[in-house]
């Protein structure tokens, strides 16, 4: 997983904890290597980090199916992480009973991978998207598939660290462009 070292090299000293956490949460996860990297890819997409998405997408850790599934799950969560909080924030009990009529056919095929992996990628993206309804839903489904609390904690840790790395890299790229003073 060369992408981890490539990402760590981009993080400045003030983000040393984030740099060290990248190793801990991805390379030493209780999840399978595929699931850990897929969760990182989905979280990077949700964090809108093209740099991290490209680094993971170019790495050979994920096969084409899991790469596509992580991106599909994250894209769907980009929609759902807005829709479901909107319904909740509206406070309209009638709206909560109306079908969203948003296309989500990828759920039927789990993005081309097993259901557990697809739900795990959706959870990682929803954590970054901060959709409480979505996090609860995916978390519960994953518990029902047999994932442990520790494994689900690791999804949260991956999402948190990837999100932090994305923020640091976004700011640092602006500093390099001269848009911000260091």
Q: What label would you give each PLM region?
A:
Residues 1-182:
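Hydrophobic alpha-helical segments
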